[in-house]
């Protein structure tokens, strides 16, 4: 399980480092797949950034604030050096805090913020006794925090378009 968490953290760190502005407008809905997922566990998904545009082939994503309770957390993350906001209002991930440990810490802080501020999850998914994965679809495109009822999972991911493989 620790190896999977490390690999996931490295993957998310890579996505965060290459995230930057591009000129394709994000349209449609997306999905997040949690694999492996623990049986009989509730996963809460929180949208923390809007996805304005993306280029799937280059793995480039342009994010903006959501205009809700997450904006204060995003401002705090900018102050702490995890994120940057450029002059056009696009949120990018800092290259100075892009290590797997930094990504995990950012995710932990985001989940603590959601709990402390009683933020309602954008979506929830409960796995069955025999489920080893969970897919949450129909999500607005954006950057999401995923937390579990057991605290076993704490990660960040982009809701990819439904056609994304």
Question: Residue ranges of each PLM-predicted region?
Answer:
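Solvent-exposed loop/turn and edge beta-strand elements of beta-rich ligand-binding domains
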Residues: 1-165
């Amino acid at each position: 399980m620790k190896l999977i968490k490390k690999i996931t953290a490295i993957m998310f760190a890579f996505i965060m480092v290459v995230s930057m502005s591009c000129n394709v407008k994000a349209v449609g809905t997306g999905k997040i797949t949690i694999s492996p997922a623990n049986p009989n566990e509730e996963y809460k998904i929180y949208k923390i950034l809007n996805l304005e545009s993306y280029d799937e082939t280059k793995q480039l994503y342009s994010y903006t604030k959501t205009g809700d309770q997450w904006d204060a957390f995003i401002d705090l993350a900018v102050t702490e050096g995890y994120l940057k906001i450029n002059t056009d209002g696009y949120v990018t991930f800092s290259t100075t805090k892009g290590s797997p440990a930094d990504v995990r810490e950012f995710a932990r802080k985001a989940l603590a913020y959601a709990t402390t501020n009683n933020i309602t999850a954008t979506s929830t998914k409960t796995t069955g006794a025999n489920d080893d994965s969970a897919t949450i679809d129909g999500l607005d495109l954006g950057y999401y925090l995923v937390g579990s009822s057991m605290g076993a999972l704490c990660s960040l991911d982009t809701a990819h378009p439904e056609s994304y493989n």
